[in-house]
């Protein structure tokens, strides 16, 4: 009785009321609310004999559709070629759980297994099949973005032979081994395997991406665990898995080999725990208005494998218009762009106890946003790609027109540049309001180690005509700028004293031939300071800082233990807490 009531949307309380109303002569009896037991639904490619047929399904979508608050959908091992939509809600104390069965390998893929091939060129083993799919239909080149740079990169099609990715060409006569071509006019897909094998014999597994999303969680209070997501044909700036509901928990999942972004988070209070974002075409993940996002114990590595423009949107992640995001105890490594990128109107975000290493652009790039707290991180080996537009953003940490930040107890070692302030004339939308001017001010950079960074340990890249980054006494008054519609909104008469930039108690150690403290962009007035005394005398920055030898046990092995008498320890510049993949502490 109670199970039927719940399945038909009738609450246990409603059932009791109807029962009492129908039997008023029995008013002396006491009626209690029926107990509704949570159910477990099973999903498996083939029937499991030990489970009732009424409790198992062939597709995840069928199982999810039956789930109610407190239920669990257990997915057994298999490759599931479907798009799963979760649009019902759990409850705070009764979330809906969707998880891989213990010890089983579960994949949700955007690719179908293609078997209907015809050979078109016997000596070269070029094959053709039907292709009714079009993913970007709003411009002539079927790409996003629609510029020439992304003419090929911005396409969405993907083909895999035995798990190996084929390259794409834009003309049929350019086919070579290991490539494919999509003819949208004739709706044909042409494939030439890298090993020239006969794929029509069905001895090879040929998969092609046909779904632009593999998962969309719209509901609140949903838990996802232990699933691998891959091979979606999503366009740039679109997640292969999308999480738009609130209070979602994603644990032990992998997002990989998608055409663009592995996942997109836009609900509030989402927790992402022990997940891997790897080998995605554009980004590991994106987030927008994902207030309270917490990413903990995750690995974000080798993303932007298609080569999207690093200065547009590419690399480990991009987070926009989000308040209170926390990235902790995670690794952001070897991404082809920034390791961590916050851009546009973010507020009060935190990055702590992370390894941020060997990313092609900045380790952390905090752009036109507010109030970053970055502390107790190891940030090494970032910024060495040739990205001409990345001036002021080829460093361990770059604050780009982003005020009210606190940067403390980070090891910023061995990057192209150590710490950057990047300034242009910028505005940003606010989370709860219209756009406004934004610039670097009220910054606290304290108790960090900045050592062995190739070009310099600190560089203030201020590309502004008003010379705000110089003390008033050092400014060369520029001619008045022409009036513009937004002139009144932007700050005027600024000087370094008014910016309230604090560099305090940092430890600096340039290696041989490396810079210490640069100020100003190279194409305008700038200085290269060779001593902290000169920095203090001219800029009044660097209070309590020291230039002193900094040594580690083995930088290449990320054994960053230091001697007990290290100045990093004495000055309080050494990270506290554990950081994944790094050995920290005192070495005797």
Tell where the protein language model's regions lie, with residue ranges.
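Bacterial N-terminal signal peptides
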Residues: 18-32
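Sec/Tat signal peptide C-region and signal peptidase I cleavage site
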Residues: 34-37
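Mature catalytic domains of secreted/periplasmic carbohydrate-active enzymes
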Residues: 248-249
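N-terminal secretory signal peptides that target proteins for export/translocation
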Residues: 1-16
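Glycine- and acidic/polar-rich repeat regions and solenoidal domains
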Residues: 211-215, 230-245, 260-270, 278-545, ...
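Extracellular polysaccharide-degrading/modifying enzymes targeting complex plant/algal/animal polysaccharides
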Residues: 40-245, 503, 514-515, 524-549, ...
């Amino acid at each position: 009785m109670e199970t039927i009531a719940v399945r038909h949307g009738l609450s246990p309380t409603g059932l009791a009321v109807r029962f009492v109303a129908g039997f008023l002569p029995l008013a002396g009896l006491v009626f209690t609310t029926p107990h509704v037991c949570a159910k477990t639904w099973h999903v498996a490619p083939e029937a499991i004999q030990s489970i009732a047929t009424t409790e198992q399904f062939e597709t995840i979508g069928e199982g999810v559709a039956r789930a109610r608050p407190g239920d669990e959908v257990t997915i057994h091992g298999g490759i599931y070629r479907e798009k799963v939509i979760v649009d019902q809600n759990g409850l705070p104390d009764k979330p809906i759980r969707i998880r891989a069965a213990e010890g089983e390998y579960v994949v949700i893929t955007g690719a179908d297994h293609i078997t209907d091939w015809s050979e078109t060129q016997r000596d070269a083993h070029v094959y053709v099949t039907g292709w009714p799919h079009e993913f970007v239909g709003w411009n002539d080149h079927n790409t996003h973005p629609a510029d020439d740079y992304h003419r090929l990169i911005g396409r969405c099609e993907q083909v895999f032979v035995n798990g190996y990715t084929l390259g794409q060409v834009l003309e049929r006569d350019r086919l070579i081994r290991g490539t494919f071509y999509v003819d949208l006019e004739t709706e044909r897909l042409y494939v030439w395997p890298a090993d020239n094998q006969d794929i029509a014999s069905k001895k090879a597994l040929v998969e092609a991406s046909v779904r632009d999303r593999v998962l969309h969680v719209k509901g609140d209070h949903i838990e996802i665990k232990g699933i691998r997501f891959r091979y979606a044909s999503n366009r740039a700036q679109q997640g292969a898995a999308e999480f738009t509901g609130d209070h979602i928990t994603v644990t032990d999942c992998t997002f990989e080999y998608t055409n663009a972004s592995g996942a997109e988070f836009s609900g509030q209070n989402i927790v992402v725990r022990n997940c891997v974002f790897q080998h995605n075409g554009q980004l590991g993940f994106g987030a927008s208005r994902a207030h309270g996002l917490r990413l903990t114990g995750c690995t974000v590595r080798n993303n932007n494998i298609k080569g999207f423009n690093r200065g547009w949107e590419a690399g480990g992640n991009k987070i926009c218009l989000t308040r209170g995001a926390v990235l902790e105890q995670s690794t952001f490594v070897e991404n082809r762009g920034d390791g961590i990128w916050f851009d546009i109107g973010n507020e009060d975000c935190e990055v702590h106890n992370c390894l941020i290493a060997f990313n092609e652009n900045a380790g952390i790039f905090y752009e036109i946003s507010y109030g970053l707290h970055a502390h107790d991180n190891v940030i090494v080996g970032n910024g060495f790609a040739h990205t001409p537009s990345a001036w002021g953003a080829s460093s361990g940490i770059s604050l780009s027109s982003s005020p009210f930040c606190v940067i403390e107890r980070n090891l910023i070692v061995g990057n192209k540049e150590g710490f950057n302030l990047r300034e242009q004339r910028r505005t940003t939308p606010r989370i709860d309001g219209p756009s406004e001017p934004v610039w670097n001010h009220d910054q606290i950079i304290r108790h960090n180690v900045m050592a062995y960074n190739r070009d310099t340990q600190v560089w203030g890249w201020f590309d502004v005509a008003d010379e705000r980054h110089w003390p008033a006494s050092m400014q060369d008054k520029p001619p008045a700028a022409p009036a513009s519609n937004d002139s009144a909104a932007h700050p005027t008469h600024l000087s370094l004293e008014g910016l309230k930039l604090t560099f305090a108690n940092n430890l600096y150690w340039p290696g041989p031939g490396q810079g210490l403290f640069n100020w100003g962009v190279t194409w305008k007035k700038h200085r290269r300071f060779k001593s902290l005394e000169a920095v203090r005398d001219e800029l009044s920055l660097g209070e309590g800082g020291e230039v002193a030898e900094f040594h580690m046990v083995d930088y290449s092995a990320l054994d960053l233990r230091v001697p007990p008498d290290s100045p990093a320890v004495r000055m309080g510049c050494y990270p506290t807490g554990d950081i994944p993949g790094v050995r920290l502490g005192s070495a005797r």
